[in-house]
Regions:
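Terminal substrate-recognition subdomain of acyl/acetyltransferases
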Residues: 165-177
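Acidic/polar helix N-cap motif
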Residues: 9-12, 140
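Acetyl-CoA-dependent GNAT
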Residues: 3, 10, 21-30, 38-113, ...
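Conserved GNAT acetyl-CoA-binding A-motif
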Residues: 128-139
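Conserved active-site alpha-helix within GNAT-family acetyltransferase domains
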Residues: 119-120, 139-156, 163-166
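Hydrophobic pocket/interface hotspot
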Residues: 16, 20
Length: 177
C-alpha cells in the first residue's frame, strides 16, 4: 500500500523531526558539514522546530503535510510565505509577492522514493495558482529533476546557505490560472 498524506498534528512533531534528520543524513552527507549532521542536539533542534510550527505558527501562514506508511511518518513537507530576498523571481523584474509561496521542506525516506509520495506531499502544500519559489542544494540532481518535472525553473539566483554552508540554487514555478 502506498503512503497516505495527511495534515500533521502536534503529536507528530517528534516523528517529523526524525524524518527531517534522517533524510538529511541520507541526502546531505558529503554536501553539508559532518559537524552539523552529527551534532548531538540536531534532533532536539528539529523536534523543537516542528513543535513550534505545529503548535504556535499562524494556521494560515504555513501549510504542512506528513506522509504515513504502516503507521510511520515517512515524508514531510511545508510551504509558507515567501522569502523575499529582494531578488527578482523567475528571471523577471518582479520580486515575489506576499500571496506567493515558498516551499521550505520536502523530504521523504529513500525507501519511499518512486512511490509518488514526493508528488503527493508537494501537491498537499502548494496551490498551483500561486507562484512558488524554493532553494535546492546544488548538487542534488534527483531533487532538481523532480522540481523541474513540476514546472520549477532555476532563475539564476545562487547562494551559499549561512547555516550549513551549502550552495543552493533558487527555482521558481509561476502560478497557473
Amino acid at each position: 500500500m502506498a503512503p497516505t498524506v495527511r495534515r500533521p498534528v502536534p503529536a507528530d512533531a517528534a516523528a517529523m523531526a526524525r524524518v527531517h534528520v534522517d533524510t538529511w543524513l541520507e541526502t546531505y552527507r558529503g554536501i553539508m558539514p559532518d559537524k552539523l549532521l552529527d551534532a548531538p542536539d540536531f534532533i532536539d533542534r528539529r523536534r523543537q522546530m516542528w513543535t513550534n510550527i505545529l503548535t504556535e505558527a499562524a494556521p494560515s501562514a504555513f501549510i504542512c503535510a506528513a506522509a504515513e506508511h504502516d503507521g510511520e511518518i515517512v515524508g514531510i513537507a511545508m510551504s509558507g510565505p515567501p522569502q523575499n530576498d529582494g531578488e527578482p523571481a523567475g528571471g523577471g523584474t518582479e520580486a515575489l509577492r506576499p500571496e506567493d509561496r515558498h516551499l521550505y521542506v520536502l523530504y521523504a525516506y529513500r525507501s519511499v522514493h518512486g512511490t509518488g509520495v514526493g508528488q503527493d506531499l508537494l501537491d498537499a502544500v502548494l496551490d498551483p495558482s500561486a507562484t512558488t519559489a524554493l532553494w535546492v542544494a546544488d548538487p542534488n540532481p534527483r531533487a532538481q529533476a523532480f522540481y523541474a518535472k513540476n514546472g520549477f525553473v532555476a532563475d539564476g539566483t545562487v547562494k551559499t546557505d549561512e547555516y550549513d554552508g551549502v550552495r543552493e540554487v533558487r527555482m521558481v514555478r509561476p502560478g497557473r490560472a
